[in-house]
């Protein structure tokens, strides 16, 4: 809840008008708080008439996850468990967990209007590219959770990407980046139980280095794909790409723009992948 308007209204009203002035200020402050809340909310014809951006992001995420699960032909127990695990990892309260479950179930329906839902989501997010890419990142991670990307899943992911404003080339490039990034976190957020223990902790370079160790280990070619650069690019070009991606996936900035705080660990994981890829390139190239 927002109380700033009420508090300021009462203080100012009381100072200039005593008790009655304070009460009047409290009422005006309440109206101001309500207006400010509405400015931070959006319309949604699918979920509810008025919804916060954070709730829109969360519910759209699970609705599309449900639709993505159905794209393979049928929703398996593993798909349902994956969604439930994600809800647990996000530490959703009872009310939000129910919203997420309802959204997932609605997404499984044959007549789920995926394009319409994504269009509303894009508008609701203010068409912020970083938020939209984070949303797509989550969906791609889910599709790869079983280490196998079904053709129908890939085509649905492109439909989502297209509605978010990406071209086929941009989508294919992002898919390659995401596939390479998985090498730096042993399969992605959905298979990383340790992130539950690391919630809300400050990560550092040691965490980055430890987080991407796999049985085979990521290659420098994977690192180039994660940053979207070429092997022949100079240090300035690579650093520019690294800084741009880190800025786009900064957890605190994403939350401030509308990413639910419960999804901050996903943003942290993406930042870890980017950092680990950059560190590996610098090590191989001998860059300081």
From Swiss-Prot:
Tell me what organism the protein belongs to: Mannheimia succiniciproducens (strain KCTC 0769BP / MBEL55E)
Task: Give one GO molecular function term.
Answer: protein-folding chaperone binding
Q: Name one Pfam family in it.
A: DnaJ
Q: What is this protein called?
A: Co-chaperone protein DjlA
Q: What functional role does this protein have?
A: Regulatory DnaK co-chaperone. Direct interaction between DnaK and DjlA is needed for the induction of the wcaABCDE operon, involved in the synthesis of a colanic acid polysaccharide capsule, possibly through activation of the RcsB/RcsC phosphotransfer signaling pathway. The colanic acid capsule may help the bacterium survive conditions outside the host.
Question: Does this UniProt record's set of keywords contain Isomerase?
Answer: no
Q: What is its main location?
A: membrane
Q: Which UniProt keywords apply?
A: Cell inner membrane, Cell membrane, Chaperone, Membrane, Transmembrane, Transmembrane helix
Check the record and name the HAMAP family matching this protein.
DjlA (MF_01153)
Alphabetical list of SUPFAM superfamilies matching this protein: Chaperone J-domain
